[in-house]
Amino acid sequence: MAETIHFGEKFRTSLAKYFAIKSVTDHAFNHNIDAEFSGSDTVHIYEIATTELNNYNKSVDPSTGSRFGNVVEVGDHRYTFKLTQDVSLDRAVDRGNNDAVFNIKKAGAIMKAYIDKVIRPFKDKYRLGKWCTEAGIHVELAAAPTKSTIVEQIIDLHNAMIEEGVPENEGTLYIARNNLKYLKLAAEWVGLDSLGGKTLPKGTVGMFDGLVVQPVSSRKFPANCYFAIFVKDSIIAPEKINTFRGIKDSENMDGDRLQYRCKFDAFVMPNLAAGAAVACAASAVTKTPTVAISSGKATVTSDEGVVYYTLDGSDPRYLSADAK
């Protein structure tokens, strides 16, 4: 009779921490965001809905009204996301090849090997791809960066975010390794002051324009993207481990098995999309449509692609159910 080992929350947490140590994306997003799972693959994200300020009016009689203006009940926005990635492992340890006892320690060693070589690279590449694709700002560069142009290009992209109200010093600059050399060789980078006692996420190489600089293997970075800037609250990467267990004396073989399953995904928050910005090759950016309104009729013109629109002011890129 096979014996199943179910690994507790403490062991799962230790593996999650191990994943985060070397992940290039785990430090970039907010892990404490207000999220609620519905079933195994739907997650709801809640955010306080803010309104415009009132004008204090001293001429209002307090017995008949409020000098503070209209009373508005505090509400929230709820965003619903569907987890599309459902990955699994089913690995066997044949008794003829295994002299060690199969237990939590053995399972942990196997899982750490898979985290290093398979799971972490896959998740990092997927997250970067989704965040870059769904970013609120895409800037096309006329030519690939060089050591004489990259500094100005990074500052211009960062300024575009700040102009949209994004916090100045809360972002991470992701840059492909094949472009990092141009930043490091730029005169402005060479002349930067020492970071002193600042603590930076492991694997980062410094700060520039208030941004933590995170190099990424060119193989993990999306094609036609040179660099990207992400602010923590603008990107999320929800996940849920559904199964993690060891099976001793498996009925299907003379040995033991380790089974793992995880559902996950990555998204850009619709109302904070300006906190995700990407510098791309010109060929990778869709031209912005033009809208002309005359006599109550809107005419939309676009050079390419399919144009989606909404009637309530929401962004059709993220709320596809309401887009037309």
What are these regions, as identified by a protein language model?
Residues A282-K324:
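Short, compositionally stereotyped local motifs that mark structural "simplifiers"
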Residues N242-P289:
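Extended, compositionally biased alpha-helical segments that mediate assembly or anchoring
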Residues L53-Y56, R91-A92, Y182-L185, M269:
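Short helix/loop capping segments that flank catalytic or ligand/cofactor-binding pockets
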Residues G39, H44, M161-G246:
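Extended oligomerization regions of viral-like shell subunits
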Residues N70-A109:
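Long, hydrophobic/aromatic-enriched structural stretches that serve as scaffold segments
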Residues M1-F81:
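N-terminal "assembly arms/tails" that initiate or stabilize quaternary assembly
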Residues R95-E164:
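Alpha-helical scaffold segments that mediate packing/assembly in large oligomeric complexes
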Residues N57-V60, V190-D193, S314-K324:
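Acidic Ser/Thr/Pro-rich low-complexity disordered segments
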